[in-house]
Amino acid sequence: METGRQRGASAEMFAMPQGLKGSNKDGIPEDLDGNLEEPRDQESELRSQDVMDLTEGDNEASASAPPAAKRQKTDTKGKKERKPTVDAEEAQMTTLLYAMSEEQLSRYEVCRRSAFPKARIAALMQSITGRSVSENTAIAMAGIAKVLVGEVVEEALDVCEMWGETPPLQPKHLREAVRRLKPKGLFPNSNYKKIMF
Protein backbone atom coordinates (compact mmCIF):
# COMPACT_ATOMS: atom_id res chain seq x y z
CA MET A 1 0.00 0.00 0.00
CA GLU A 2 1.42 3.37 -1.06
CA THR A 3 0.92 6.51 0.99
CA GLY A 4 1.66 10.13 0.11
CA ARG A 5 2.07 9.43 -3.60
CA GLN A 6 -0.16 8.61 -6.49
CA ARG A 7 0.06 5.23 -8.09
CA GLY A 8 2.63 5.00 -10.84
CA ALA A 9 4.60 8.06 -9.70
CA SER A 10 8.27 7.38 -9.20
CA ALA A 11 10.65 9.14 -6.86
CA GLU A 12 12.38 10.68 -9.88
CA MET A 13 9.30 12.77 -10.63
CA PHE A 14 9.53 14.43 -7.24
CA ALA A 15 13.28 14.96 -7.37
CA MET A 16 14.69 18.45 -8.00
CA PRO A 17 15.81 19.10 -11.60
CA GLN A 18 19.53 19.08 -12.14
CA GLY A 19 21.39 22.40 -12.21
CA LEU A 20 18.91 24.20 -9.95
CA LYS A 21 19.50 25.03 -6.35
CA GLY A 22 16.81 24.72 -3.71
CA SER A 23 13.51 26.54 -4.11
CA ASN A 24 11.33 28.51 -1.73
CA LYS A 25 7.83 27.50 -0.67
CA ASP A 26 6.30 28.85 -3.94
CA GLY A 27 8.47 26.55 -6.03
CA ILE A 28 10.57 29.43 -7.40
CA PRO A 29 14.30 28.66 -7.50
CA GLU A 30 16.24 30.58 -4.86
CA ASP A 31 18.65 32.13 -7.37
CA LEU A 32 15.71 33.60 -9.34
CA ASP A 33 13.64 34.43 -6.26
CA GLY A 34 15.33 37.78 -5.61
CA ASN A 35 14.65 39.06 -9.13
CA LEU A 36 10.95 38.38 -8.83
CA GLU A 37 10.49 40.09 -5.48
CA GLU A 38 11.68 43.52 -6.62
CA PRO A 39 8.92 44.13 -9.17
CA ARG A 40 6.32 42.98 -6.64
CA ASP A 41 7.54 45.61 -4.20
CA GLN A 42 7.44 48.32 -6.87
CA GLU A 43 3.98 47.23 -7.95
CA SER A 44 2.62 47.35 -4.40
CA GLU A 45 4.15 50.83 -3.93
CA LEU A 46 2.41 52.02 -7.10
CA ARG A 47 -0.89 50.52 -5.99
CA SER A 48 -0.69 52.15 -2.57
CA GLN A 49 0.20 55.48 -4.23
CA ASP A 50 -2.85 55.18 -6.51
CA VAL A 51 -5.05 54.46 -3.51
CA MET A 52 -3.65 57.52 -1.73
CA ASP A 53 -4.35 59.66 -4.80
CA LEU A 54 -7.93 58.41 -4.91
CA THR A 55 -8.56 59.01 -1.23
CA GLU A 56 -7.15 62.54 -1.25
CA GLY A 57 -9.91 63.69 -3.60
CA ASP A 58 -12.63 61.81 -1.70
CA ASN A 59 -12.44 63.45 1.70
CA GLU A 60 -16.09 64.48 1.33
CA ALA A 61 -17.28 60.93 0.53
CA SER A 62 -19.85 59.38 2.81
CA ALA A 63 -19.03 56.70 5.35
CA SER A 64 -21.22 54.18 3.54
CA ALA A 65 -19.12 54.39 0.36
CA PRO A 66 -16.82 51.42 -0.32
CA PRO A 67 -13.10 51.82 0.38
CA ALA A 68 -11.05 53.46 -2.34
CA ALA A 69 -9.21 50.23 -3.11
CA LYS A 70 -12.52 48.49 -3.94
CA ARG A 71 -14.00 51.23 -6.11
CA GLN A 72 -14.06 50.62 -9.80
CA LYS A 73 -12.85 53.21 -12.24
CA THR A 74 -15.78 54.97 -13.88
CA ASP A 75 -15.94 56.39 -17.35
CA THR A 76 -16.13 60.14 -16.87
CA LYS A 77 -15.87 60.98 -20.56
CA GLY A 78 -19.38 59.71 -21.32
CA LYS A 79 -20.87 61.65 -18.42
CA LYS A 80 -19.19 64.91 -19.41
CA GLU A 81 -20.43 64.60 -22.98
CA ARG A 82 -23.92 63.63 -21.90
CA LYS A 83 -24.46 66.33 -19.29
CA PRO A 84 -24.38 69.38 -21.62
CA THR A 85 -27.09 67.88 -23.83
CA VAL A 86 -29.29 67.34 -20.79
CA ASP A 87 -28.68 70.93 -19.70
CA ALA A 88 -29.51 72.17 -23.21
CA GLU A 89 -32.72 70.13 -23.22
CA GLU A 90 -33.66 71.45 -19.78
CA ALA A 91 -33.03 75.03 -20.91
CA GLN A 92 -35.13 74.49 -24.04
CA MET A 93 -37.92 72.93 -21.98
CA THR A 94 -37.84 75.82 -19.50
CA THR A 95 -38.07 78.30 -22.37
CA LEU A 96 -41.05 76.45 -23.84
CA LEU A 97 -42.82 76.33 -20.47
CA TYR A 98 -42.39 80.08 -19.97
CA ALA A 99 -43.75 80.72 -23.49
CA MET A 100 -46.92 78.67 -22.89
CA SER A 101 -50.20 80.29 -22.10
CA GLU A 102 -52.01 79.35 -18.90
CA GLU A 103 -54.38 77.05 -20.79
CA GLN A 104 -51.51 75.31 -22.58
CA LEU A 105 -49.60 74.91 -19.32
CA SER A 106 -52.58 73.32 -17.58
CA ARG A 107 -53.10 70.94 -20.55
CA TYR A 108 -49.41 70.06 -20.47
CA GLU A 109 -49.55 69.26 -16.75
CA VAL A 110 -52.65 67.09 -17.17
CA CYS A 111 -51.06 65.25 -20.08
CA ARG A 112 -47.85 64.73 -18.15
CA ARG A 113 -49.64 63.28 -15.12
CA SER A 114 -52.00 61.06 -17.10
CA ALA A 115 -51.28 57.40 -17.68
CA PHE A 116 -53.11 54.32 -18.84
CA PRO A 117 -53.53 51.66 -16.14
CA LYS A 118 -50.90 49.05 -16.88
CA ALA A 119 -52.96 46.17 -15.49
CA ARG A 120 -55.83 46.92 -17.87
CA ILE A 121 -53.45 47.32 -20.81
CA ALA A 122 -51.89 43.95 -19.96
CA ALA A 123 -55.33 42.32 -19.68
CA LEU A 124 -56.41 43.78 -23.02
CA MET A 125 -53.22 42.62 -24.73
CA GLN A 126 -53.59 39.18 -23.18
CA SER A 127 -57.19 38.87 -24.40
CA ILE A 128 -56.15 39.82 -27.94
CA THR A 129 -53.01 37.71 -28.22
CA GLY A 130 -54.10 34.80 -26.04
CA ARG A 131 -50.72 34.79 -24.29
CA SER A 132 -49.40 36.23 -21.08
CA VAL A 133 -47.81 39.67 -21.37
CA SER A 134 -44.74 40.79 -19.45
CA GLU A 135 -44.84 43.89 -17.30
CA ASN A 136 -42.31 45.68 -19.51
CA THR A 137 -44.44 45.04 -22.59
CA ALA A 138 -47.51 46.46 -20.85
CA ILE A 139 -45.55 49.55 -19.78
CA ALA A 140 -44.29 50.08 -23.33
CA MET A 141 -47.78 49.67 -24.80
CA ALA A 142 -49.23 52.10 -22.24
CA GLY A 143 -46.61 54.66 -23.27
CA ILE A 144 -47.34 54.17 -26.97
CA ALA A 145 -51.08 54.51 -26.33
CA LYS A 146 -50.49 57.75 -24.43
CA VAL A 147 -48.50 59.17 -27.34
CA LEU A 148 -51.21 58.14 -29.81
CA VAL A 149 -53.97 59.75 -27.75
CA GLY A 150 -51.87 62.90 -27.44
CA GLU A 151 -51.44 63.14 -31.20
CA VAL A 152 -55.16 62.58 -31.83
CA VAL A 153 -56.10 65.25 -29.28
CA GLU A 154 -53.63 67.75 -30.77
CA GLU A 155 -54.98 67.13 -34.27
CA ALA A 156 -58.56 67.41 -32.95
CA LEU A 157 -57.70 70.77 -31.36
CA ASP A 158 -56.30 71.94 -34.70
CA VAL A 159 -59.52 70.83 -36.41
CA CYS A 160 -61.61 72.62 -33.80
CA GLU A 161 -59.61 75.84 -34.28
CA MET A 162 -59.73 75.56 -38.08
CA TRP A 163 -63.51 75.16 -38.03
CA GLY A 164 -63.78 78.28 -35.88
CA GLU A 165 -65.16 76.43 -32.88
CA THR A 166 -63.96 76.52 -29.31
CA PRO A 167 -63.12 73.60 -27.03
CA PRO A 168 -64.28 71.31 -25.45
CA LEU A 169 -63.63 68.73 -28.13
CA GLN A 170 -66.60 66.98 -29.63
CA PRO A 171 -66.76 63.55 -31.26
CA LYS A 172 -66.87 65.16 -34.72
CA HIS A 173 -63.47 66.79 -34.01
CA LEU A 174 -61.97 63.48 -32.95
CA ARG A 175 -63.38 61.66 -36.00
CA GLU A 176 -61.92 64.30 -38.32
CA ALA A 177 -58.56 64.09 -36.52
CA VAL A 178 -58.44 60.31 -36.97
CA ARG A 179 -59.45 60.70 -40.63
CA ARG A 180 -56.56 63.14 -41.16
CA LEU A 181 -54.03 60.97 -39.33
CA LYS A 182 -54.84 57.77 -41.28
CA PRO A 183 -53.01 58.84 -44.47
CA LYS A 184 -49.94 59.65 -42.34
CA GLY A 185 -49.76 55.98 -41.35
CA LEU A 186 -50.67 56.46 -37.71
CA PHE A 187 -53.68 54.13 -37.98
CA PRO A 188 -53.92 50.91 -39.93
CA ASN A 189 -56.56 50.72 -42.62
CA SER A 190 -59.34 48.68 -41.04
CA ASN A 191 -61.25 48.33 -44.32
CA TYR A 192 -58.38 46.58 -46.07
CA LYS A 193 -59.49 43.48 -47.98
CA LYS A 194 -56.94 41.17 -49.46
CA ILE A 195 -57.61 40.73 -53.17
CA MET A 196 -56.99 37.12 -54.05
CA PHE A 197 -57.08 37.40 -57.87
From Swiss-Prot:
GO BP annotation list: RNA polymerase II preinitiation complex assembly
GO MF terms, alphabetically ordered: protein heterodimerization activity
Compositionally biased region (Basic and acidic residues): 37-50, 72-86
Gene Ontology CC terms: transcription factor TFIID complex
Region Disordered, annotated ranges: 1-88
Tissue-specific expression: Expressed in fetal brain and testis.
Gene3D superfamilies attached to this UniProt entry: Histone, subunit A (1.10.20.10)
SUPFAM superfamilies: Histone-fold (SSF47113)
Highest taxon, organism lineage: Eukaryota
InterPro entries listed in its UniProt record: Histone-fold, TAF11-like, TAFII28_dom
Family as reported in the entry's similarity comment: Belongs to the TAF11 family.
PANTHER family, alphabetized: TATA-BOX BINDING PROTEIN ASSOCIATED FACTOR 11 LIKE PROTEIN 2-RELATED (PTHR13218:SF15), TRANSCRIPTION INITIATION FACTOR TFIID SUBUNIT 11-RELATED (PTHR13218)
UniProt-recorded name of the protein: TATA-box-binding protein-associated factor 11-like protein 12
